[in-house]
């Protein structure tokens, strides 16, 4: 990814941000189209930088939401209850239609543990692999903690919206789109309300119903 940041008018504080990357094409070759320039003014840049700083300073968080996950013709919907304490996480997934539920817990620096209905347990070094072996779902667990909050962790190609927030992200073969945001509230900046991720035949659509700030 190449990012060119030019000072268009210092008096007006307007900047031209050109994020050069390739969008996934519709052809089987997976070609990409170059993005168009996005105008991000200085005020929006300051607000977004403050938001990124706030995210870094608040590592304990959680949310309640819903997710639709599909792999080709197979898929399902689950309720999601996510608690994140620094690098540690506890995620409850429940599928009302099939009456199945799973609890995924662990740390980004340690093994993952998945518990299912009936008391069975799977343990592995990579949370994504543990979840895939049990459910058949491809879910980028290592990327989601940053994605779900719209945090720029680096390592991916990013297209910004006019507010300076991430609009599209390409990382490790995944394409992520931010579709909707919660407005800012007292003591909390804007946070994603709806995101969509895809890689090959894998599709994930997440809707956050409520954000929670957890006490350390």
Curated annotation (Swiss-Prot):
Q: Where is the lipid attached (S-diacylglycerol cysteine)?
A: 26
Gene3D superfamilies assigned to the protein according to its UniProt record, in alphabetical order: Lipoprotein localisation LolA/LolB/LppX
> What does the record say about its membrane topology?
Lipid-anchor
Q: Where is the lipid attached (N-palmitoyl cysteine)?
A: 26
Biological processes annotated in GO = lipoprotein localization to outer membrane; protein transport
The reply on keyword Metal-binding is: no
Which Pfam families is this protein grouped with? LolB (PF03550)
Q: Which domain of life is it from?
A: Bacteria
For this chain, the family text in UniProt reads: Belongs to the LolB family.
The record describes its quaternary structure and partners as: Monomer.
Its biological function? Plays a critical role in the incorporation of lipoproteins in the outer membrane after they are released by the LolA protein.
- By what name is this protein known? Outer-membrane lipoprotein LolB
